[in-house]
Amino acid sequence: VTDHPPGFFQGTEMPTAGWWEALWPDPARVLSAVGLRPGMNVIDLCSGDGWFTLQIAKGAQHVFAIDIDPILLEVARHRLVESGLTNCEFIAGDAYNIARLAGPVDFIFLANAFHGVPDRFRLAKAVGGALKANGLFAIVNWHKRPRDETPILGEPRGPKTELRMSPEETIESVEAGGLKFRKKIDIPPYHYGVIFGL
């Protein structure tokens, strides 16, 4: 029995309060490292509670925060309202429908969710349909390491070991959907980033 909405990606639940902030103390640095630049129109795909959405909105022209979970979107909305930011739309919808929900945009950001996507080919195709001709798609994901080896605040964290993907597996999956690999970076302590274009 699950209380997740239909279409929820496996192993992508938002964490309990505390350790997420400990893992991502400087979201601006992560976003800059994967190619986000001021003035872009951006989709934060599978945006969750808005931890990265807030930082994206500080420099973006406009942000579309898309998530399947309307409750998490309300948390994200509240986070941005408290910060006085008004350049974000919150859209409850399926990631596979991204091109119908928003876009075309300069940048699509997907953090901590690609490992749980059942049909990665379909998602990559959908992302391609929501990007401008020179747009970028950035995935931030957990390294393929045993969960016991990725502790935060003294506890193993992140998706189950068997769900994790190497950068190479991620690149192969996205390229199969028609996007072109541009760059790979390491994001300590436990993540990597891969950037794609059309």
Predicted regions and their residues:
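Active-site beta-strand termini and strand-to-loop segments that position acidic
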Residues: 196-198
